[in-house]
Amino acid sequence: MFVLIVGAGRVGSAVAKSALTAGHQVSVLDEDPLSHERLDAGQSRSWEDSGGQFTVGTALETDALIQAGIERAEVFIASTAGDNTNLIIAQIAQKRFGIENVYVRVMDPARAGWYGEQGLHTISPTKHAIEMFERALQPELA
């Protein structure tokens, strides 16, 4: 399966490495050329030597998305640090390029529901943390 991940921060690079290890074709797009170092970190071979692709560019630019392989992507993951950017690029992937499996990292839990209504799969670390803390505060059932 061809996976395109936008954002090579902690989350994006970890998911990219995991997907490549699982045997998927993986392309990562990030505007910071130094973010490539996260993909190489802790590996015996470079990201490219391991079969990964890295493209420097802004995901809001169609040319960068095409260079990164969006036209053949079966899964699209938007994992930049910005909720607005993630929503826009996820909708581009979904509506313009017809990708059905679009996953979006959403920091603001209030937005996650709306994103879901747009047909996007949302992952909200903040919402997950809130739920975990709330469970920790519930009295144990006897």
Language-model regions: role of each:
Residues M1-A142:
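Cytosolic regulatory regions of ion transport systems
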